[in-house]
UniProtKB/Swiss-Prot annotation:
Provenance organism: Paracoccus denitrificans (strain Pd 1222)
Keywords: Ribonucleoprotein, Ribosomal protein, RNA-binding, rRNA-binding
Annotated HAMAP family: Ribosomal_uS11 (MF_01310)
Family annotation (Pfam families): Ribosomal_S11 (PF00411)
Description of how the protein assembles with itself and partners: Part of the 30S ribosomal subunit. Interacts with proteins S7 and S18. Binds to IF-3.
GO molecular function, one term: rRNA binding
SUPFAM superfamilies attached to this UniProt entry: Translational machinery components (SSF53137)
UniProt keyword Ribosomal protein present: yes
Protein function: Located on the platform of the 30S subunit, it bridges several disparate RNA helices of the 16S rRNA. Forms part of the Shine-Dalgarno cleft in the 70S ribosome.
GO annotation terms (biological process): translation
Encoding gene, per UniProt annotation: rpsK
Any one of the GO CC terms: ribosome
UniProt key word Ribosomal protein: yes
InterPro entries reported in the protein's UniProt record: Ribosomal_uS11, Ribosomal_uS11_bac-type, Ribosomal_uS11_CS, Ribosomal_uS11_sf
Protein name (database record): Small ribosomal subunit protein uS11
Length: 129
């Protein structure tokens, strides 16, 4: 059986000066997506893709490593300034923000876009440990 020759699609380098970093920090994981102003994804990373498993994904250190990874990928596409949108109640919010600043981005705005229910769904019951 002959093998089909498929071309491997290379990532083209985009030249984007400003971007938006979406930091989604839940109780179990932290995901970072860096997009352009229109919302098209440039780079992304999460604590799970960095190799952390289980409860280690929810640590601030895992969020820091994921933010550094997404930031370095975005810098290859020419992103220099960022607006940061933070969402969720997790522990990786602050450390992901600090890591993005440490990579060398000029952060112009920080917005908290966590959805707040106006007496919507019933929350989960309290844990008894």
């Amino acid at each position: 059986m002959a093998r089909d020759k498929t071309r491997i699609k290379r990532k083209e380098r985009k030249n984007i000066a400003t971007g938006v970093a979406h930091v989604n920090s839940s109780f179990n994981n932290t995901k970072i997506l860096i997009s352009d102003v229109q919302g098209n994804a440039i780079s992304w990373s999460s604590a799970g893709t960095m190799g952390f498993k289980g409860s280690r994904k929810s640590t601030p250190y895992a969020a820091q490593m994921a933010a550094e990874d997404a930031g370095k990928k975005a810098q290859e596409h020419g992103v220099r300034t960022l607006e940061v949108e933070v969402q969720g109640p997790g522990s990786g919010r602050e450390s992901a923000l600090r890591a993005l600043a440490a990579v060398g981005f000029n952060i112009t705005a920080i917005r908290d876009v966590t959805p707040i229910a106006h007496n919507g769904c019933r929350p989960p019951k309290r844990r008894r440990v």
